[in-house]
Each structure stands twice: as structure tokens, then as C-alpha cells.
């Protein structure tokens, strides 16, 4: 179970295209798994989300000012106003609307554990989103994810993954969409004291689009998750973390607050 709340500002301009995204985004997800045997399991993941004008712009303006950081992209936008608009090189303009709350796509899959340090999951994402156009995949998609884990020392655990995905082109941006994707993660968890641990995780995703001339859409995504984990007496975990966008360069996700619970 996880809850993410993010404040996002994107303002990309090229001589032939323009992209503005000013929004606060909510995502809640719940994942369930059931063992089929010692080395296989089924999984199900459901989610809900929302896209809002929000309330955090004033705080973020103060925060950036306190750090001496000037963000002209935020200064050019009115506070707590939603906008999601893409102007493309071919003259088309695509707009997305905000939505208070909607159901997300449903993910089902089967996993295999050949040994304690390796896991493979094959999953299908079903287009069940009830949100406005652009907030769900719109078509079924396939994913293969391989994850490895290793104890580097009694206090340090490493985990990395490589995933391949296929999503058929669809919607108003179909001619610019890529269909094959690669994602990878690499991270460590360091035991601090008692049931407390710190974690950091680097995330990579190949570009989603091509030919838009907009860096936020045509380039790869690279981000860093970091935060704190508290293990419960029953074996579950509470996670509190943040995410920092590293690439593409320029303003992106200002702040992501993430809370997760496993049982």
C-alpha cells in the first residue's frame, strides 16, 4: 500500500513546440500477492489518483526563496492554477483536464522466485481507468521485470531491477509514442538502529515519445528516491520518502511525498 502526492511544474519551449504542466498529483495504490508454491505467486495491483490545481505553490515559493533558488517557471504561473497543455510541431494542441479522483488501471501478473536473490514477474496492465483522457494507458500493456537482491554486509542490502515493457500506440499522441520501453533501478538499504533503516534508489526509464522536440517528452527519465523505513513488530514496514528528478534537466517534479505500508 502506498500514497504519493507530488507538485509538478514543467515549462518546455522550443521554436516549434510548447509544453506546460502545472499540477499537483495524487496516487494511491494497493498491491496484493498470493503464493502458488515455494517459487511462484500471483499478484494484483489496483490504484486511484487525481490531478489538482493544488495548494502547495505558496509553500514551494517560500522554500525556494529560503534556499536562494529562483524558478522562473513558477514565477510565470499563477499560484494554485491547473494547466496541462502540449503544442506540437505539426500545429496540434493537446489539453488535459483536471480530475478530483478516479480509478487507475489494473495490473495482474505471475511471479517466479528461482532462488532467494532473484525474482521474475510477468504482468498485464488492463485499461480500467475512469479518469479523463490521458490519465490511463487506454490499451492493454505487457511488462517483464527481473529483480535481484544481495546482502552486501550485515547492515547493507542491495536491490536492482531491469524491466521491459510494450504498450501499443493509442490516443491523440499515437504518432509520437514509443511502444517498447526499458526501465532499471539500483538501490541500497542501510540499517541504522533497531528497526530503522535509510534507503536510496536510482530509477531510469527510456523515453516515452519521439519527434516532439520537447526535452521533457523525448528524453530519458532519471530520478532518485530516498527516505526512511521503520519495520513493525509484525514484520511489516512503514516507508516515508521523497523523489528528486535528475533528468531531463530543468524544473520537473518539485516535491514528491511518499508514504507506504507493507504487511
Language model segments and positions:
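Transmembrane beta-barrel architecture of outer-membrane proteins
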Residues: 23-27, 103-107, 139-143, 181-183, ...
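Outer-membrane pore/translocation modules
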Residues: 47-179
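Transmembrane beta-barrel strands of outer-membrane/channel proteins
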Residues: 1-7, 44-48, 120-126, 160-166, ...
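Outer membrane beta-barrel transmembrane domains
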Residues: 64-94, 173-263
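Sequence/structural signature of outer-membrane beta-barrel proteins
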Residues: 4-15, 51-53, 117, 125-134, ...
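Surface-exposed strand-loop-strand hairpins of Gram-negative outer-membrane beta-barrel proteins
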Residues: 1-27, 94
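Residues on the lipid-exposed face of transmembrane beta-strands in outer-membrane beta-barrel proteins
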Residues: 28-34, 44, 108-112, 122-124, ...
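Repeated loop/turn-to-beta-strand initiation elements of outer-membrane beta-barrel proteins
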Residues: 39-44, 116-120, 154-160, 194-200, ...
Amino acid at each position: 500500500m502506498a500514497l504519493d502526492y507530488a507538485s509538478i511544474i514543467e515549462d518546455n519551449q522550443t521554436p516549434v513546440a510548447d509544453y506546460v504542466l502545472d499540477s499537483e498529483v495524487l496516487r494511491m495504490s494497493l498491491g496484493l500477492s498470493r503464493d502458488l508454491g515455494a517459487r511462484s505467486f500471483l499478484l494484483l495491483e489496483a490504484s486511484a489518483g487525481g490531478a489538482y490545481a493544488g495548494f502547495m505553490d505558496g509553500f514551494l515559493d517560500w522554500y525556494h526563496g529560503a534556499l536562494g533558488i529562483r524558478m522562473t517557471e513558477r514565477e510565470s504561473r499563477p499560484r494554485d492554477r491547473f494547466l496541462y497543455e502540449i503544442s506540437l510541431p505539426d500545429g496540434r494542441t493537446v489539453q488535459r483536464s483536471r480530475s478530483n479522483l478516479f480509478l487507475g488501471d489494473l495490473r495482474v501478473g505471475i511471479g517466479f522466485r528461482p532462488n532467494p536473490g532473484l525474482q521474475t514477474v510477468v504482468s498485464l496492465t488492463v485499461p480500467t481507468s475512469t479518469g479523463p483522457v490521458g490519465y490511463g494507458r487506454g490499451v492493454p500493456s505487457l511488462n517483464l521485470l527481473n529483480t535481484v537482491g544481495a546482502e552486501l554486509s550485515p547492515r547493507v542490502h542491495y536491490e536492482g531491477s531491469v524491466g521491459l515493457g510494450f504498450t501499443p500506440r493509442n490516443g491523440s499522441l499515437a504518432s509520437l509514442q514509443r511502444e517498447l520501453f526499458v526501465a532499471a533501478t539500483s538501490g541500497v538499504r542501510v540499517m541504522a538502529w533497531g528497526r530503522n533503516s535509510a534507503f536510496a534508489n536510482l530509477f531510469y526509464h527510456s523515453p516515452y515519445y519521439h519527434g516532439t522536440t520537447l526535452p521533457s517528452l523525448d528524453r530519458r527519465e532519471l530520478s532518485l528516491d530516498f527516505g526512511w523505513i521503520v519495520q513493525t513488530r509484525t514484520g511489516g514496514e512503514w516507508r516515508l520518502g521523497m523523489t528528486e528528478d535528475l533528468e531531463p534537466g530543468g524544473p520537473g517534479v518539485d516535491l514528491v511525498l511518499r508514504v507506504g505500508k507493507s504487511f
